[in-house]
A protein has these predicted regions:
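Alpha-helical protein-protein interaction scaffolds
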Residues: 1-62
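Structural recognition of alpha-solenoid helical scaffolds
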Residues: 47, 62-65, 74-81, 95, ...
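Amphipathic alpha-helical scaffolding segments comprising HEAT/armadillo-like alpha-solenoid repeats
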Residues: 44-53, 75-87, 109-116
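Short coil turns that connect the paired helices of HEAT/ARM alpha-solenoid repeats
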Residues: 55-58, 88-92
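Boundary/linker segments of alpha-helical solenoid repeat arrays
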Residues: 8-20, 90-99, 110-112
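Charged, low-complexity intrinsically disordered regulatory/assembly segments
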Residues: 121-218
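TPR/TPR-like (Sel1-like) alpha-helical repeat modules
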Residues: 1-13, 86-90, 117-123
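Structural detector for internal amphipathic alpha-helices that build alpha-solenoid repeat scaffolds
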Residues: 31-39, 63-73, 95-106
């Protein structure tokens, strides 16, 4: 209504500033109301779908969509359900890592036991770092950043691969491998993509290719 009055120039000049403030307030109230309604819709959807067994029956891409919905709401009421999904080995490693990252971002305190690739680790999201904040990831990234400083195209591609692999493997890093050896194997991995084949550490390359396969979300 106020906007219509402005458009039709029915508000006196001396009153326009006051009415503009009212108009802005009304817009904020409407926006907040829409946001609350949106959050309620998401919460209703999540309560319906986020049973572990039902979740496992969904295609991975649909699971990913549901996980993205979680980023828009307070996930503390769902922390026990999320814990169960993260600890379920049948849930895709990438999905489990994303759920864990959401708990970290919202600083949710709960003890979780994660097993991947024959390794197991207990952690509390409220006290944990995100995948790309882990020390060995940073070391490998810095080595490769220096090496590909003059080749931004390859470096951009490598950054994307590195971050995807770090998320899928999370909360595990490259132990027992040394960061320099991992970085060198990533260089060889990139060279193979361009048709250049060299000798490499088979165990590290196997891990890289496994992570690459898992990143396809099939």
């Amino acid at each position: 209504i106020i906007e219509t009055l402005f458009n039709e120039q029915m508000i006196p000049i001396e009153q326009q500033e006051k009415f503009q403030r009212i108009q802005e307030l009304n817009k904020r109230i409407a926006l907040n109301k829409q946001q609350l309604e949106h959050e309620k819709q998401i919460e209703s959807l999540l309560k319906e779908q986020m049973d572990v067994n039902r979740f496992l029956n969904l295609p991975v891409m649909e699971q990913l969509i549901l996980v993205q919905q979680f980023s828009e709401v307070n996930i503390r009421p769902y922390k026990n359900m999320l814990k169960g999904m993260i600890e379920e080995d049948e849930v895709h490693p990438f999905i489990r890592s994303l759920l864990l990252s959401l708990l970290i971002e919202q600083e949710v305190s709960i003890e979780i036991s994660v097993s991947k690739f024959g390794m197991e680790k207990k952690l509390n999201p409220a006290e944990s770092k995100l995948p790309t904040e882990l020390p060995q990831y940073q070391e490998i990234r810095n080595i490769l950043a220096e090496r590909y400083d003059q080749n931004p195209t390859v470096w951009e591609m490598l950054q994307e691969v590195l971050s995807k692999h770090a998320i899928i493997a999370y909360p595990f890093e490259w132990t027992p491998f040394h960061s320099v050896d991992v970085a060198n194997t990533y260089v060889q991995y990139v060279n193979e993509m361009f048709g250049q084949f060299e000798e490499h550490d088979c165990d590290i390359m196997k891990r890289i290719k496994l992570l690459d396969h898992l990143s396809e979300l099939q």
